[in-house]
């Protein structure tokens, strides 16, 4: 299984941060789906901790595929 993310948008406000990034997902060489991952993080004073990971699953053209094309290609 291969999940590739690209062009993350990171926003930070004090101890709160989010990362929004498109992704595509392959099962071996076979395309499965694509969508968006959203990660919410909190800084605990020492390090960033992931508090939630949310995502959606879509099919093109609703979502975009990785700009480099299929993995290994």
Task: Indicate where each model-derived feature is located.
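Short beta-strand edge/turn micro-motifs at domain boundaries
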Residues: 36-64
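Surface-exposed, charged secondary-structure patches
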Residues: 1-32
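Short, low-complexity N-terminal intrinsically disordered segments enriched in polar/charged residues
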Residues: 67-73
